[in-house]
A protein has these predicted regions:
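Conserved N-proximal alpha/beta basic substrate-recognition cap immediately N-terminal to
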Residues: 1-97, 116
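Short, amphipathic alpha-helical segments
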Residues: 47, 51, 85, 89, ...
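Short His-Asn-centered micro-motif
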Residues: 47-48, 111-113, 152-154
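Residues at the C-termini of beta-strands that transition into short coil/loop
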Residues: 68-71, 126, 155, 178
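Short, solvent-exposed loop/turn segments at secondary-structure junctions
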Residues: 73-74, 114-117, 156-157, 179-181
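Glycine-rich phosphate-binding loop of ATP-grasp-fold ATP-dependent ligases
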Residues: 74, 105-137
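Short, solvent-exposed polar/charged micro-motifs at secondary-structure junctions
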Residues: 75-81, 118-123, 160-165
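Phosphate-binding site of ATP-dependent enzymes
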Residues: 105-108, 133-188
C-alpha cells in the first residue's frame, strides 16, 4: 500500500462528498520524487525563506502578513532604522514597541526566517507575555539572536476558521507541478 495516500486523504479533503476520482488529485510517491527532481533549486529560496517570499510576492499585490521587523543575529531591521540589540531588556523594549503599534491585535508573530513551517520556530507575543515571567522571553531572545527571524503583524483569523482549532492559523496550500513543456498542473 501507498502510505502517502492516507496522508493525502486528509490533506486534500478526499473525505468530502463530490470527489469522483481521487486519482486526479493524488500525487503518488514515485511522481512526488519526480517532482522533486524537476524542482528548480534556483527558486527554492523564494519559497523557503519567509523574508524573500514576502519581498518577492508583495510586488504582486498579494495579501501577506506585514513584516514589522526582521533580524540577523543581534542586528534588527525596522522600517526606518537598523539597531543592535544585545540585552534582554532591549529586546523586550523592541517587542513592546512592535506590539503596541498593533492597536487592533495587540500582538505579533515571531517566525524563524527559514525552517518555521507547521508552527515550528513560530511564537506569538501579546501584551500579556511582556509582563509575565521573563524566563520564556529570555529563551526566545537567546533563540532569536542566534539566527534570523521575522516579526510580523498578528493575523486575526475569521471566527469560523478559528472554530476549527483556535490554537492554529489555518492556511490554504496549493500543490502545483510544471512539466518540461512548461504546462502547470494544480493538484490540490
Amino acid at each position: 500500500t501507498d502510505t502517502s495516500l492516507a496522508d493525502q486523504y486528509f490533506r486534500k479533503y478526499f473525505y468530502r462528498k463530490g470527489f469522483k476520482d481521487f486519482n486526479h488529485y493524488v500525487i503518488p510517491l514515485r511522481k512526488m520524487f519526480k517532482l522533486w527532481e524537476l524542482d528548480d533549486k534556483v527558486y527554492t529560496s523564494i519559497l523557503t525563506n519567509k523574508l524573500i517570499f514576502e519581498r518577492y510576492f508583495s510586488r504582486s499585490d498579494l495579501r501577506l502578513a506585514k513584516i514589522l521587523a526582521y533580524n540577523e543575529n543581534s542586528v534588527f531591521f525596522l522600517k526606518d532604522r537598523v539597531i543592535q540589540i544585545n540585552t534582554l531588556s532591549e529586546f523586550i523594549d523592541l517587542l513592546r514597541i512592535l506590539v503596541n503599534e498593533r492597536s487592533l491585535t495587540k500582538g505579533i508573530f515571531i517566525k524563524k526566517t527559514e525552517d518555521s513551517h507547521g508552527g515550528r520556530n513560530t511564537f506569538k507575543i501579546t501584551d500579556a507575555d511582556l509582563v509575565s515571567d521573563s524566563h520564556d522571553l529570555n529563551k526566545l531572545f537567546d533563540e532569536v539572536r542566534r539566527s534570523g527571524f521575522l516579526f510580523q503583524e498578528l493575523v486575526i483569523q475569521h471566527k469560523l476558521l478559528s472554530n476549527i482549532y483556535p490554537g492554529s492559523l489555518n492556511t490554504i496550500r496549493f500543490d502545483t507541478y510544471t512539466d518540461r513543456n512548461n504546462i502547470t498542473y494544480l493538484y490540490s
